[in-house]
């Protein structure tokens, strides 16, 4: 019995139930009636190829063009790419904000009090940071499933450690300053000293580090989606588009090229922004 087997370049090809092409007549004896019938059927199919206009059946008007082509389901790659970039940026910004908040609180306490408090808190960060990131990500995906919240948690669970260490070093630098000693002599409480007198001097390094962390978060999210541990279709992100485009890269290289260009431009832009902020807050680092 004949059935539709697939579509190639808009043409429907007929096969039998076994999946053999109708042009394969080697299984029939020479001169048999089955071979003659098969040959006639192939000639009929070749003369009556059915062309399918997918854009017409999808309701796309004539004269409509897609700047970057379409994906394997006919969806506009331009629209999907920028929606995916929006998701990637959302995940990156939320995760970086959470990292900065946790790092500020943790590093401020460790740096201000010092001594045993600092030693215990730093040993905790070393224990957390000792686990390989891919192991932590896999465990989170197993327990919480895939989705935006899971990816944000994966990016937060370890990445705040660097911010905490940076804040700790800033507190060690400023807590012995004369204005801090004067405020302490006047009876200013510890929390006020931390958040009103010492922390404002660290705003520049904090902002610079946050801007540097955003490209890393974008790349990590895209990498997780690419290997199947992040956001999955039908949701869109840069990593999802790269993963789907990689399957048809030889036939349709545009499905990989344009998402790769977008993620590269995003990372370059944020790196340049972070370098500019670093030079603005710390002129001694200019040109480094």
Q: What is each of the regions a protein language model found here?
A:
Residues 1-73:
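Membrane-topology segments of multi-pass transport proteins
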Residues 70-288:
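Alpha-helical transmembrane segments of integral membrane proteins
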């Amino acid at each position: 019995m004949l059935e539709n087997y697939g579509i190639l370049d808009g043409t429907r090809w007929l096969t039998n139930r076994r999946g053999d092409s109708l042009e394969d007549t080697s299984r029939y004896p020479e001169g048999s009636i089955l071979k003659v019938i098969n040959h006639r059927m192939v000639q009929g199919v070749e003369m009556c190829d059915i062309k399918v206009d997918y854009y017409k059946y999808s309701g796309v008007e004539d004269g409509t063009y897609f700047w970057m082509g379409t994906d394997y389901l006919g969806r506009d790659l331009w629209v999907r790419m920028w929606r995916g970039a929006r998701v990637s940026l959302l995940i990156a910004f939320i995760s970086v904000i959470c990292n900065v908040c946790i790092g500020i609180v943790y590093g401020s306490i460790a740096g201000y009090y010092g001594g045993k408090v600092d030693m215990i808190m730093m040993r905790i960060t070393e224990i957390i940071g000792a686990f390989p990131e891919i192991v932590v990500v896999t465990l989170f995906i197993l327990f919480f499933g895939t989705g935006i919240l899971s990816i944000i948690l994966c990016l937060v669970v370890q990445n705040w450690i660097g911010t905490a260490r940076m804040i700790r070093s800033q507190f060690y630098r400023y807590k012995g300053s004369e204005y801090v000693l004067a405020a302490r002599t006047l009876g200013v409480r510890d929390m006020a000293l931390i958040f009103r007198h010492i922390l404002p001097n660290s705003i520049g390094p904090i902002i610079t580090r946050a801007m540097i962390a955003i490209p890393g978060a974008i790349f990590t999210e895209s990498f997780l989606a690419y290997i199947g541990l992040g956001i999955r279709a039908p949701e869109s992100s840069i990593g999802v588009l790269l993963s789907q485009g990689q399957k048809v890269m030889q036939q349709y290289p545009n499905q990989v090229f344009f998402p790769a260009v977008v993620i590269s431009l995003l990372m370059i832009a944020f790196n340049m922004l972070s370098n500019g902020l670093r030079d603005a807050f710390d002129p001694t680092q200019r040109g480094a």
